[in-house]
């Protein structure tokens, strides 16, 4: 009898403590009325509005959230619009025939309107660590969230988001913006601030470190000291992230129009090494090697092209970034094996790309294009006969020419600069003039051929048959 009374009292006390903790943890909400913010429905995607109106009509809450709200408040055009609701993914799917559920780690509903996808997420809740939660919530030994499908309230959802500036909620029901974490103030002050304990949040998802840097570069903001402090010592946690996810993140970092500024921040916070270990081995103390100069220049050029609404290709970016590690590797293989430089170059391409893909799962369609651009570099100097015309017809000639021009610029090499000038004139000349340019090449004295020593037999490489 005494035991039963004691258990009853223990349950009552624990319930009261839990309710008290929740009351303390419950954030104070700031409601910003329509006349005090700049968001207008005319700036929101019609499809996002349709999704929110239908959810509201069905009796659910629906809020615009995340980067879309942030960008609208900053007067920028959002790239996409995300919606959050108290409806579960299955309930969302019942409301929209054009909906599919995606994700195991984070269960989401994608409502598709042709090429536009409106992402709908259910309010996330806190992790209590109950046994019954293991099917919906799971952590790795290092604290990383392997599964996060515990649903909760909008107040809990605000606390579960990454940065304060991304935790602002806009309602089409009353046109207000709700702020539970001080996001409006940080937005005005230009501060990137993580919600909650930074080290815990980074361990939950190490990609948040990359996102902090990306937002700082993209928005021209500064990272708050408490948010920045753990990043350098936790940077190696990125090694636990699947390479496919890191590849997608690398494109967001370097091909979104702010690649050069992002690159500088990645290096400052020691985040570049987990993404590109092959490249960081060749960094110099003064940062003025040809490799470092070509990375800076290709990122600046990429940013300019994006801001001018011109196309960019990751294959060209990777071809430029990995060019000098490729040359070093090819030279080393040639010296150690006695292979011709052409054969050593081919093996070096495999080695460099294999190592790159261990960190970033670069798709084969891109590595194939990167190889083409590299191989054409060896052919650009051989222009006699029909070679120049054949090279001009290659689908990757223009990309190869652009890399040649970049090399000439960063190496300050007079011979490369003359070659760039020749190809620049040749590709825009009329056929008769092109023939004249080739005839002039034939009249130039050919370099004296050196007598070659007999080639050593190449040792058998590991892993080859």
From Swiss-Prot:
Propeptide stretches in the record: 1-10
GO MF, any single term: ATP binding
GO cellular component: cytoplasm; cytosol; plasma membrane
Highest taxon listed in the record's lineage: Bacteria
InterPro entries: NT_sf (IPR043519), PolA_pol_head_dom (IPR002646), PolA_pol_I (IPR010206), PolyA_pol_arg_C_dom (IPR025866), PolyA_RNA-bd (IPR032828), tRNA_ntf/polyA_polymerase_I (IPR052191)
The EC number(s) this enzyme carries: 2.7.7.19
Localization in the cell: Cytoplasm; Cell inner membrane
Region annotation Disordered: where it falls in the sequence: 429-465
Entry keyword Transferase: yes
Segments of skewed composition (Basic residues): 448-459
Pfam family, one: PolyA_pol_RNAbd
UniProt KW keywords: ATP-binding, Cell inner membrane, Cell membrane, Cytoplasm, Membrane, mRNA processing, Nucleotide-binding, Plasmid copy control, RNA-binding, Transcription, Transferase
Function, in words: Adds poly(A) tail to the 3' end of many RNAs, which usually targets these RNAs for decay. Plays a significant role in the global control of gene expression, through influencing the rate of transcript degradation, and in the general RNA quality control. Rho-independent transcription terminators may serve as polyadenylation signals. Seems to be involved in plasmid copy number control.
Subunit relationships: Monomer. Interacts with CsdA, RhlE and SrmB.
Leftover remarks: Uses the non-canonical initiation codon AUU, which limits pcnB expression.
PANTHER family named among the record's database cross-references: POLYNUCLEOTIDE ADENYLYLTRANSFERASE FAMILY PROTEIN
Family, similarity comment: Belongs to the tRNA nucleotidyltransferase/poly(A) polymerase family.
Protein name as catalogued: Poly(A) polymerase I
UniProt organism field: Escherichia coli (strain K12)
Lineage: Bacteria, Pseudomonadati, Pseudomonadota, Gammaproteobacteria, Enterobacterales
Gene: pcnB
């Amino acid at each position: 009898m005494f035991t039963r009374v004691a258990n009853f009292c223990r349950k009552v006390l624990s319930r009261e403590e839990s309710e008290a903790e929740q009351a303390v943890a419950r954030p104070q909400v700031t409601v910003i009325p329509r006349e005090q913010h700049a968001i207008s429905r005319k700036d929101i995607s019609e499809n996002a509005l349709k999704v929110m109106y239908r959810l509201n009509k069905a009796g659910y809450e629906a809020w615009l959230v995340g980067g879309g709200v942030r960008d609208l408040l900053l007067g920028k055009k959002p790239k996409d619009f995300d919606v959050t609701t108290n409806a579960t993914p299955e309930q969302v799917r019942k409301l929209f025939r054009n909906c599919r559920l995606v994700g195991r780690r984070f269960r989401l509903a994608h409502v598709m309107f042709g090429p536009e996808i409106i992402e709908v997420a259910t309010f996330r809740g806190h992790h209590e660590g109950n046994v019954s939660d293991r099917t919906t919530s799971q952590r790795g030994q290092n604290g990383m969230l392997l599964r996060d499908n515990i649903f909760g309230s909008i107040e809990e959802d605000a606390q579960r988001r990454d940065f304060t500036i991304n935790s602002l909620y806009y309602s089409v029901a009353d046109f207000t913006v709700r702020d539970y974490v001080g996001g409006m103030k940080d937005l005005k002050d230009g501060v990137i601030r993580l919600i909650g304990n930074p080290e815990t949040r980074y361990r939950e998802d190490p990609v948040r470190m990359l996102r902090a840097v990306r937002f700082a570069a993209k928005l021209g903001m500064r990272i708050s000291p408490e948010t920045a402090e753990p990043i350098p010592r936790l940077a190696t946690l990125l090694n636990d992230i699947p390479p496919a996810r890191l590849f997608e993140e690398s494109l967001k970092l370097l091909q979104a129009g702010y690649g050069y500024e992002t690159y500088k921040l990645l290096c400052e916070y020691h985040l570049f090494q987990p993404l590109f270990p092959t490249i960081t081995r060749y960094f110099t103390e003064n940062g003025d090697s040809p490799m470092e100069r070509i990375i800076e220049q290709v990122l600046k050029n990429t940013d300019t092209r994006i801001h001018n609404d011109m196309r960019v290709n990751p294959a060209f970016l990777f071809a430029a970034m990995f060019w000098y590690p490729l040359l070093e590797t090819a030279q080393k293989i040639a010296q150690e094996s006695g292979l011709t430089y052409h054969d050593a170059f081919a093996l070096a391409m495999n080695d460099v790309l294999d190592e790159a893909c261990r960190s970033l799962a670069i798709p084969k369609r891109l590595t194939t294009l990167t190889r083409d651009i590299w191989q054409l570099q060896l052919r650009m100097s051989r222009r006699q006969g029909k070679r120049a015309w054949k090279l001009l017809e290659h689908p990757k000639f223009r990309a190869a020419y652009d890399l040649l021009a970049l090399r000439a610029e960063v190496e300050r090499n007079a011979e490369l600069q003359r070659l760039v000038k020749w190809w620049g004139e040749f590709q825009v000349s009329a056929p008769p003039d092109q023939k004249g340019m080739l005839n002039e090449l034939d009249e130039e004295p050919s370099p004296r051929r050196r007598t070659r020593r007999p080639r050593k037999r190449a040792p058998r490489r590991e892993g080859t048959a």
